[in-house]
């Protein structure tokens, strides 16, 4: 039985004797349970249904109380399939919310919404557990300092820097490199910040969850030989799960991240893929509970639900949780209530471009569409701000000239525009970077580029000092010194060929 690990076993047995209810009604994943007078469970309490099916199959379903209906009835949402449940079955009130394992024992493992390992690697140490429902940190505990979270990825740090303890939206279609970018961030936070990551797979395809796990093992983010040295914990509630599980799996991942922040005092990266599915699951549960739908059929509690998740993702004086959330935009409609509610909480957006991916420029982050509230002179400094603006202006001018180049060719441009195009093409290539996690696929070693080095490199390109170098010298290199070295090698090679 999945008892609440925070309660000792004698208490559980008395709870089982005292607080037993019975199923009165089952509608899909929603159960109505009748309790004796005066023994009603609290909202968000975990209920456990145990028993046997008619064919003798063992049943163990955990539910969460969502509504108190009156007449000693509560309405609960199941966290797993309700097949085989019948009216009259006994329901145990655990007396506390769902609790999940936290701490170092979670690293390198895959969990479901209940905090149970699903990777067939044996049980997890459950001595340290934490309830998934908690209030956000008090205002006095928050760290109000606006500081940049250096990722070591040039295009991100220069043009759309992440805020330490901020929330970032990751926009991109299939096959443009979201997973590789996520894995590189997990790798870099572990190496540069000594931090850990938690990945919450919310309502996405099970194939994607499996692929991510395999790629993490291949790239060393999950260390198979020594699980304790892994840098990430995975929590999955995929498309095949009932809406209750998909709605709560984000909170399970967040609870694990909060422990690393508050107790271990670490910098944590929390990935949520996909935040839209969290809203979608909430909408399904809301309809099942009989609530009147609001705008576009979404739940009336949309803003509150989103807020209760997002407000727990923050920096405190102990550590920080920086969250990167993949955002699916239904029918590409940015005004849809789900993405619109998400945007209100984001500090930065990283947009991946299929055009750049097709050119082979990875990471395929669009330098013009990606934005950040941190890119202000008073936060990043005048030098960083000026360099970023000039890079954007040069890229924008190149974009405007592309139609003319396609029709008339480069020769028809003015001298000034030709120079702008040459520098913009160098910038475009210099924004690419070899990743540590892609080493196994590309064969070229990964590079972590500090912010100072990044700014220096782009200043040299913009100043015209490197106008004589071929543009391919800037492709897939780390800092600017590597680009000049690569240019010399290319020159030597071309002389040898002649």
From Swiss-Prot:
What InterPro entries does the entry give?
AAA+_ATPase (IPR003593), ATP-synt_VA_C (IPR055190), ATP_synth_F1_bsu (IPR005722), ATPase_a/bsu_AS (IPR020003), ATPase_alpha/beta_chains (IPR050053), ATPase_F1/V1/A1_a/bsu_N (IPR004100), ATPase_F1/V1/A1_a/bsu_N_sf (IPR036121), ATPase_F1/V1/A1_a/bsu_nucl-bd (IPR000194)
Chief subcellular location equals plastid
Binding of ATP, residues: 172-179
SUPFAM superfamilies (UniProt xref): C-terminal domain of alpha and beta subunits of F1 ATP synthase, N-terminal domain of alpha and beta subunits of F1 ATP synthase, P-loop containing nucleoside triphosphate hydrolases
Kindly give the Gene3D superfamilies that the UniProt entry links to this protein. 2.40.10.170, Bovine Mitochondrial F1-atpase, Atp Synthase Beta Chain, Chain D, domain 3, P-loop containing nucleotide triphosphate hydrolases
Q: Where in the cell is it found?
A: Plastid, Chloroplast thylakoid membrane
Name the keywords, alphabetized: ATP synthesis, ATP-binding, CF(1), Chloroplast, Hydrogen ion transport, Ion transport, Membrane, Nucleotide-binding, Plastid, Thylakoid, Translocase, Transport
* GO MF term set: ATP binding; ATP hydrolysis activity; proton-transporting ATP synthase activity, rotational mechanism
Q: What is the membrane topology here?
A: Peripheral membrane protein
Biological processes, Gene Ontology terms: proton motive force-driven mitochondrial ATP synthesis
- Whether Membrane counts among this entry's keywords is yes
Q: Which GO cellular component terms are attached?
A: chloroplast thylakoid membrane; mitochondrion; proton-transporting ATP synthase complex
NCBIfam families reported in the protein's UniProt record: atpD
Subunit structure, per the record? F-type ATPases have 2 components, CF(1) - the catalytic core - and CF(0) - the membrane proton channel. CF(1) has five subunits: alpha(3), beta(3), gamma(1), delta(1), epsilon(1). CF(0) has four main subunits: a(1), b(1), b'(1) and c(9-12).
Family (UniProt): Belongs to the ATPase alpha/beta chains family.
Briefly state the protein's biological role: Produces ATP from ADP in the presence of a proton gradient across the membrane. The catalytic sites are hosted primarily by the beta subunits.
**Name of the featured protein:** ATP synthase subunit beta, chloroplastic
Q: Which organism is it from?
A: Chamaerops humilis
């Amino acid at each position: 039985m999945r008892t609440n690990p925070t309660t000792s076993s004698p208490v559980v047995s008395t709870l089982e004797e005292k607080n037993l209810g019975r199923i009165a009604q089952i509608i899909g994943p929603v159960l109505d349970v009748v309790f004796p007078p005066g023994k009603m469970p609290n909202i968000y309490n975990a209920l456990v249904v145990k028993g046997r099916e008619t064919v003798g199959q063992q049943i163990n379903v955990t539910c969460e109380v969502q509504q108190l209906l009156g007449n000693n009835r509560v309405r609960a949402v199941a966290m797993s399939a309700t097949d085989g449940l019948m009216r009259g079955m006994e329901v145990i009130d655990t007396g506390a919310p769902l609790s999940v394992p936290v701490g170092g024992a979670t690293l390198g493992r895959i969990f479901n919404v209940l905090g149970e390992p699903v990777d067939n690697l044996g049980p997890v140490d459950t001595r340290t557990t934490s309830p998934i429902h908690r209030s956000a940190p008090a205002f006095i505990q928050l760290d109000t300092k606006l500081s940049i979270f250096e990722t070591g990825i040039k295009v991100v740090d220069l043009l759309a820097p992440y805020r330490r303890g901020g929330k970032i939206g990751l926009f991109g279609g299939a096959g443009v490199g979201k997973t590789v970018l996520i894995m590189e961030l997990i790798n870099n936070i572990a190496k540069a910040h000594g931090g850990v990551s938690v990945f919450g797979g919310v309502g996405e395809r099970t194939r994607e969850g499996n692929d991510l796990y395999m790629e993490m093992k291949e790239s060393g983010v999950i260390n198979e030989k020594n699980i304790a040295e892994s840098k990430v914990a995975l929590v999955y509630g995929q498309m095949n799960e009932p809406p209750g599980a998909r709605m709560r799996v984000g909170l399970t991942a967040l609870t694990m991240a909060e422990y690393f922040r508050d107790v271990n005092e670490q910098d944590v990266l929390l990935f949520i893929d996909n935040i839209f599915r969290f809203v979608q699951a909430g909408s399904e549960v809301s309809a099942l509970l009989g609530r009147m739908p609001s705008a576009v059929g979404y739940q009336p509690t949309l803003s509150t639900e989103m807020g209760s998740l997002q407000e727990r993702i923050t920096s405190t004086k102990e550590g920080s949780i920086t969250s990167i959330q993949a955002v699916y935009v239904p029918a590409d409609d940015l005004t849809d209530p789900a993405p619109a509610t998400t945007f209100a909480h984001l500090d930065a957006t990283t947009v991946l471009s299929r055009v750049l991916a097709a050119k082979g420029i990875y990471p395929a982050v669009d330098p013009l569409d990606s934005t950040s509230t941190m890119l202000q002179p008073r936060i990043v400094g005048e030098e960083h701000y000026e360099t970023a603006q000039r890079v954007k202006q040069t890229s924008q001018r190149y974009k405007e000239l592309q139609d003319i180049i396609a029709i008339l060719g480069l020769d028809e441009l003015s001298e000034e525009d030709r120079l702008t195009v040459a520098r913009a093409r160098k910038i475009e290539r210099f924004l690419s970077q070899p990743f540590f996690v892609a080493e196994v696929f590309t064969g070229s070693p990964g590079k972590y580029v500090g912010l100072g080095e990044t700014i220096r490199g782009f200043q040299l390109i913009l100043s015209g000092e490197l106008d004589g170098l071929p543009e391919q010298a800037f492709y897939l290199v780390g800092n600017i010194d590597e680009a000049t070295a690569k240019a010399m090698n290319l020159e030597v090679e071309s002389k040898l060929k002649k």
